[in-house]
């Protein structure tokens, strides 16, 4: 689901060799800070921002030949802090002062700045959370990533409205602290070692998690004992990638065992959007998924000016903001009519998030002169809703995520009736719907370990990494564990096999799409990411482990 390549906008593969400052950057506030190199030093000047000024400008990700680049090349790509002068200025700005920095129309206050461009260090999204009462320096006194909080509920510290202005924007540096245990044993050689724990190695952790998943429904006492041991071995989300990933799966199983659901406080949306944007800047996963999906859509929309997208995976709408901009660039000679129908499950989607996404997409569309009609419907109505046949002059596209496999049979029957122009499906690499719950957990643990390894390789700002894990990856793991453990009758087959069984045929990605994806990965500052082709899917992998894949489908001709 996704965010922008904010630094470069080219026109096709031929432009990859000339990523220059001539390409405009999407604005986020009335004034943007630009840096000029003079005499080996950097100097800042303020220049008026270009139109449009939508808060979704920074959500625009590369989707076609005219917008492909990498957000890793900029100063903010890895969450680095600004210069000392900027830091001092930022430290004095509270959330209450944000309203004075931007226009007040269309709710461009706190959330507007959160979605804004991150080229100005004083407005960098990672810094929004630096001094939040929810996080303290003492939480990060151990090496590794993650918040040292065994409860780990998103509502652990509810922030009262009276303290909102205390959330200061700054660029404080996170200090790495040496493990106290290492210091202690380094100077006291005769101190007896701690009691030996039960096989704390990778194999032991994985086996215990798999066993807990096997017996969590049939033998709760045994599952509780296994998780109690894991609580001692994995007391906090710090350490190596496997240990951090295992911690989150252990927490998800604990919540499942005790029937605990996470309650979001009113400020969780701010934290989640900030983590989402940081993840897009640090990792190519989101850009790859959005770019590849949108390129397939654009190729299928050729010759149409009335477009209808049925979306089962809306996220924050960044994919569609990018697509709208691409449509304007390609078809500026003819008026465009775009309709987006969102199907969302009330159990898995927050109404505040959906409303935020809906309003901002409308605002963005109005600024680039696209006629947009967007509506949100409950997924529960899918089986009873009557859908009119589409016109021959209208292109219908469907966006699906493999993560919604529990609803996939119902969704595909509905989609088959629509007979869309194209269907795009994204797969996060952690979904193995043909496996039983315990084996699915082991596969997902391996996939998330690879994701953490890829994030560690970037060597990004520690605080940004902690926010990504807590507000983006941990909720994803909890949802995955909860959804797969529910007693729903589901066919034991892959989602690809279900597509074929329901009467859909795969569509091969164009050579242009593959070349653009390769160029995207090559712009990533670390080595280890690579693109693979598997059947009709285009995959982004880390060290041969799939992180995300995108495939395109059509209704099979009868």
Swiss-Prot record:
Residues 54-75 have a biased composition (Low complexity). It comes from the Eukaryota. It comes from Arabidopsis thaliana. GO terms for cellular component: nucleus. GO terms for biological process: cell differentiation; cell division; circadian rhythm; regulation of DNA-templated transcription; root hair cell tip growth. Residues 396-479 are annotated as: PFYRE. Residues 196-554 form the GRAS domain. InterPro entries: TF_GRAS. Residues 203-257 are annotated as: Leucine repeat I (LRI). Residues 276-340 are annotated as: VHIID. Residues 482-554 are annotated as: SAW. Residues 19-90 are annotated as: Disordered. Coiled coil: none annotated. This is Scarecrow-like protein 6. Keywords: Nucleus, Transcription, Transcription regulation. The gene is SCL6.
């Amino acid at each position: 689901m996704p965010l922008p390549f904010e630094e470069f906008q080219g026109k096709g593969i031929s432009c990859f060799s000339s990523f220059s400052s001539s390409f405009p950057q999407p604005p986020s506030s009335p004034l943007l800070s630009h840096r000029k190199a003079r005499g080996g030093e950097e100097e800042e000047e303020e220049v008026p921002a270009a139109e449009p000024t939508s808060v979704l400008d920074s959500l625009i990700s590369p989707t076609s030949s005219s917008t492909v680049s990498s957000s890793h090349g900029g100063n903010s790509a890895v969450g680095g802090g600004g210069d000392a002068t900027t830091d001092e200025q930022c430290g004095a700005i509270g959330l209450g002062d944000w309203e004075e920095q931007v226009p007040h129309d269309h709710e461009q206050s706190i959330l507007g700045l959160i979605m804004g461009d991150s080229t100005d260090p004083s407005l960098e999204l990672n810094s929004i959370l630096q001094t939040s009462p929810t996080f303290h320096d003492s939480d990060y006194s151990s090496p590794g990533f993650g918040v040292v909080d065994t409860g780990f509920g998103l509502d652990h510290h509810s922030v009262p409205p009276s303290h909102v202005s205390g959330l200061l924007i700054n660029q404080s540096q996170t200090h790495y602290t040496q493990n106290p245990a290492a210091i202690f044993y380094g100077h006291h050689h005769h101190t007896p070692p701690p009691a030996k724990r039960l096989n704390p190695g990778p194999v032991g952790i994985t086996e215990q998690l798999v066993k807990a998943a096997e017996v969590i429904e049939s033998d709760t006492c045994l599952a509780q004992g296994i998780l109690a041991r894991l609580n001692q071995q994995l007391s906090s989300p710090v350490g190596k990638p496997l240990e951090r990933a295992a911690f989150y799966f252990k927490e998800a199983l604990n919540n499942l065992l005790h029937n605990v659901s996470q309650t979001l406080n009113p400020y969780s949306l701010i934290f989640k959007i900030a983590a989402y944007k940081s993840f897009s800047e640090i990792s190519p996963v989101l850009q790859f998924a959005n770019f590849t999906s949108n390129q397939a859509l654009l190729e299928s929309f050729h010759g149409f000016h009335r477009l209808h997208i049925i979306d089962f995976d809306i996220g924050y709408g960044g994919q569609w903001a990018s697509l709208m901009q691409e449509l304007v660039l390609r078809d500026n000679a003819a008026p465009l009519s775009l309709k987006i129908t969102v199907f969302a499950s009330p159990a898995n989607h927050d109404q505040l998030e959906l409303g935020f996404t809906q309003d901002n997409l409308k605002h963005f569309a109005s600024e680039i002169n696209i006629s947009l009609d967007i509506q949100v419907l409950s997924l529960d109505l899918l089986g009873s809703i009557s859908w009119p046949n589409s016109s021959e002059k209208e292109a219908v596209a469907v966006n699906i995520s493999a993560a919604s496999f529990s609803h996939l049979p119902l969704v595909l029957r509905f989609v088959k009736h629509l007979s869309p122009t194209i269907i795009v499906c994204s797969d996060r690499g952690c979904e193995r719907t043909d496996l039983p719950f315990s084996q699915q957990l082991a596969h997902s643990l391996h996939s998330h370990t690879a994701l953490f390894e890829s994030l560690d390789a970037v060597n990004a700002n520690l605080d940004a990494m902690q926010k990504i894990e807590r507000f983006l990856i941990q909720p994803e793991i909890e949802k995955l564990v909860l959804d797969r453990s529910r007693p729903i009758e589901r066919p034991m087959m892959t989602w690809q096999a279900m597509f074929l069984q329901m009467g859909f045929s795969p569509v091969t990605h164009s050579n242009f799409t593959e070349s653009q994806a390769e160029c995207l990965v090559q712009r990533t500052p670390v080595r280890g990411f690579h693109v693979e082709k598997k059947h009709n899917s285009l995959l982004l992998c880390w060290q041969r482990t799939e992180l995300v894949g995108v495939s395109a489908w059509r209704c099979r001709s009868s």
